[in-house]
């Protein structure tokens, strides 16, 4: 399988690639991807969980037990649970968010999709998401998997990230550019 060397060159990319290969061999790619999405949501919502994975004072066994409990609460599959245990045993839990992102990119590339992250000041409705997905599909020529988030600090407009490309049409960026131009 051909994977971007940029993804696999990083530590998190190597872990994600290994997990993808295991999941692919066992036919669990979509199940593992769903598990990782649950974990990602839990990491975004829980400051305690985020603190747990970034705590360097936590021992391997403690981290493993804590993550096993989290995996049980989230209903994660056996492969994902074992993988998170390996990260805990290797003291690499802090890489988990990057591993999740890299796994998603690898899985999307395998399906011929491109992942796009869209940040807006307000939640987008279904029609806006559909229209944006179509525009991005026309621009890239590939199927788009859209992940949306809300950041009121951008004031308005959108910030779209597709792979290493970023399209920033936020009002905050425009105001910052105007302020810089006025200083010059």
From Swiss-Prot:
Keywords tagged on the record: ATP synthesis, Cell inner membrane, Cell membrane, CF(1), Hydrogen ion transport, Ion transport, Membrane, Transport
UniProt key word Cell inner membrane: yes
Topology in the lipid bilayer: Peripheral membrane protein
Coiled coil segments of this chain: none
GO cellular component: plasma membrane; proton-transporting ATP synthase complex
Disulfide bonds listed in the record: none
GO molecular function ontology, one term from the record: proton-transporting ATP synthase activity, rotational mechanism
SUPFAM superfamilies reported in the protein's UniProt record: N-terminal domain of the delta subunit of the F1F0-ATP synthase
Superkingdom, taxonomy of origin: Bacteria
Protein's job: F(1)F(0) ATP synthase produces ATP from ADP in the presence of a proton or sodium gradient. F-type ATPases consist of two structural domains, F(1) containing the extramembraneous catalytic core and F(0) containing the membrane proton channel, linked together by a central stalk and a peripheral stalk. During catalysis, ATP synthesis in the catalytic domain of F(1) is coupled via a rotary mechanism of the central stalk subunits to proton translocation.
Subunit structure as annotated in this protein's UniProt entry: F-type ATPases have 2 components, F(1) - the catalytic core - and F(0) - the membrane proton channel. F(1) has five subunits: alpha(3), beta(3), gamma(1), delta(1), epsilon(1). F(0) has three main subunits: a(1), b(2) and c(10-14). The alpha and beta chains form an alternating ring which encloses part of the gamma chain. F(1) is attached to F(0) by a central stalk formed by the gamma and epsilon chains, while a peripheral stalk is formed by the delta and b chains.
Presence of keyword Iron: no
InterPro entries: ATP_synth_OSCP/delta_N_sf (IPR026015), ATPase_OSCP/d_CS (IPR020781), ATPase_OSCP/dsu (IPR000711)
Sequence similarity: Belongs to the ATPase delta chain family.
Protein name per the record: ATP synthase subunit delta
Location relative to the cell: Cell inner membrane
